[in-house]
Amino acid sequence: RYYTFNREDEGEVNERMGCSAQWFKTGHKFYAVRDDSRKVEDLWLIDALAEPRPRLKTYKAELAGDKNVIQFELLIGDANTREVKKINIDRWKDQYVDILYASNDAKRLYFQRYKRTWDECEICVVDTETGEVKVLIHEVDKPYLDYQMRAIHFLNDGNEILFRSERSGWGHYYLYDKDGNL
């Protein structure tokens, strides 16, 4: 439950959680982000509307200043070879990771990682054959990056990336090529 492929934002349905594992379009490779919240501390709420009596709800929650926060792993598997690779995505301590786009040929997987302070991020691509990670875009925005306004679009199967940034103080879109060149 706390070292899982289930994504919290998928929501619980009949005590079942959604899974972060996704198939590439080719159908023989898959990728998944695994969340490790085993060391994250518990938080409690009282459900005062529960019948017949109020009920205590316990869940894991990260709070500002906590030493133990969710850790992320990226795995890529190949059903034909029955091989699963753990990809080295570590850049910053306690980083946050999002999958952005999977190429049609299953050779590239794009992800974004954020520094815990949310003032720095990187758009990266993984070569699914070798497991090599390459940084395409490195963004710094003080005091923090606006996660709600982020916009990243992959055009022509990842050959071009349209990326929204406020690096100038204003929100602008920048067009990058597949190698991260502006």
Task: Name every feature range the model reports, one short phrase each.
Residues 22, 31-37, 64-68, 102-105, ...:
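Beta-strand C-termini and the immediately following turn/loop, strongest in propeller blades
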Residues 1-6, 85-88, 133-138, 182:
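Beta-propeller fold detector
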Residues 8-17, 92-97, 141-149:
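Short glycine-/Asp-/Thr-/Trp-enriched loop segments that recur within the blades
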Residues 39-45, 71-73, 118-124, 169-174:
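Structural motif
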Residues 17-19, 70, 96-98, 119, ...:
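Beta-rich catalytic cores
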